Swiss-Prot record:
Glycosites: 69, 145
Protein name (database record): Outer capsid glycoprotein VP7
Annotated Ca(2+) 2 binding sites: 177, 228-229, 231, 301
Record InterPro entries: VP7, VP7_1, VP7_2
Remaining remarks: Some rotavirus strains are neuraminidase-sensitive and require sialic acid to attach to the cell surface. Some rotavirus strains are integrin-dependent. Some rotavirus strains depend on ganglioside for their entry into the host cell. Hsp70 also seems to be involved in the entry of some strains. In group A rotaviruses, VP7 defines the G serotype.
Residues bound to Ca(2+) 1: 95, 206, 214, 216
Signal peptide boundaries: 1-50
Domain of life per record: Viruses
Biological source species: Rotavirus A (isolate RVA/Cow/United States/B223/1983/G10P8[11]) (RV-A)
Stretch list, region LVD motif: 237-239
Assembly and interaction partners: Homotrimer; disulfide-linked. 2 Ca(2+) ions bound at each subunit interface in the trimer hold the trimer together. Interacts with the intermediate capsid protein VP6. Interacts with the outer capsid protein VP5*.
Keyword list, A-Z: Calcium, Capsid protein, Disulfide bond, Glycoprotein, Host endoplasmic reticulum, Host-virus interaction, Metal-binding, Outer capsid protein, Signal, T=13 icosahedral capsid protein, Virion
Length: 326
């Protein structure tokens, strides 16, 4: 009798001990699984929230449409604005403190002191040779001149778009333009460009390849030339290389951190008819004021609206690198 009770008690005791062991094992296993899961979740959340600097994400969509001015000024606290103006503006204003005055006025629009830079250039022709657009946002003021309107249009086409350019060795090779986005861009103190189209036997069409005097002249003594010829046809070129550099360039798209403001003029500069301009709305505007103070006051008033039609996520333009996309 006592032996049976003792055996039963022993079985219960062993069962309890075994059950306790199993429960502890399950608890330890669950703790391990839970801790591991939490660790994975923590690491994953950190990776997901972090910015991936190893991938160059493409800029999608267009920033060329008009946007309603934002009420927030915070984005401008870390941005820089360059304002390019001709020498005649400073000469007319004739005030040594005029840039300081404008800086204080820009401050009222949310642009901190020191974030706006004033860049002076002599004239359109000189600026065409050495355009350097380094700021997050760049606004170029161009006084309209009927005798320079073609130069102004070419300059606007250059700085409002990104170009991928390669050197051209015109002494050794013939060149052809593959499509409408392919142009030859020349810069220098004096660029005279002549072309001779060739047939499939590399003989001149209406010209002699050995006589540059028979070539068609497409530019004469200009500082900036964007040359467009018939696509898919080889050409032999003659360029004043001593005073001019020419490159084979491809238009990649809009340079969205640049805007051009035409000052005055009965005609409005328009480069949107170029079939390679996509979208057809460019960051080009016109201000009709006779006095430069009025021009700058208007710029200050509408600077945020102008910037909202731009994007700081564009590459800088430096003619020292001959407007490569860098």
């Amino acid at each position: 009798m006592y032996g049976i009770e003792y055996t039963t008690f022993l079985i219960y005791l062993i069962s309890i001990i075994l059950l306790n062991y199993i429960l502890k094992s399950i608890t330890r296993m669950m703790d391990y699984i839970i801790y591991k899961f939490l660790l994975i979740v923590t690491i994953t959340s950190i990776v997901v929230n972090a910015q991936n600097y190893g991938i160059n994400l493409p800029i999608t969509g267009s920033m060329d449409t008009s946007y309603v001015n934002a009420t927030k000024d915070e984005p401008f606290l870390t941005s820089t604005l360059c304002l390019y103006y001709p020498t005649e503006a400073r000469t007319e204003i004739n005030d040594n403190e005029w840039t300081s005055t404008l800086s204080q006025l820009f401050l009222t629009k949310g642009w901190p002191t020191g974030s706006v830079y004033f860049k002076e250039y002599d004239d359109i022709a000189t600026f065409s040779v050495d355009p350097q657009l380094y700021c997050d946002y760049n606004i170029v003021l161009m006084r309209y001149n009927s005798s320079l309107k073609l130069d102004m249009s070419e300059l606007a086409n250059l700085i409002l778009n990104e170009w991928l350019s390669n050197p051209m060795d015109i002494t050794l090779y013939y060149y052809q333009q593959t499509d409408e986005a392919n142009k030859w861009i020349a810069m220098g103190q004096s660029c005279t460009i002549k072309v001779c189209p060739l047939n499939t036997q590399t003989l001149g069409i209406g010209c002699q390849t050995t006589n540059t005097g028979t070539f068609e002249e497409v530019a004469t003594a200009e500082k900036l030339v964007i040359t467009d010829v018939v696509d898919g046809v080889n050409h032999k070129l003659d360029v004043t290389t001593a005073t001019c550099t020419i490159r084979n360039c491809k238009k990649l798209g809009p340079r969205e951190n640049v805007a051009v403001i035409q000052v005055g003029g009965a005609d409005i500069l328009d480069i949107t008819s170029d079939p390679t301009t996509n979208p057809q709305t460019e960051r080009m505007m016109r201000i009709n004021w006779k006095k430069w103070w009025q021009v700058f006051y208007t710029i200050v008033d509408y600077v945020n609206q102008i910037v909202q039609a731009m994007s700081k996520r564009s590459r800088s333009l430096n003619s020292a690198a001959f407007y490569y996309r860098v």
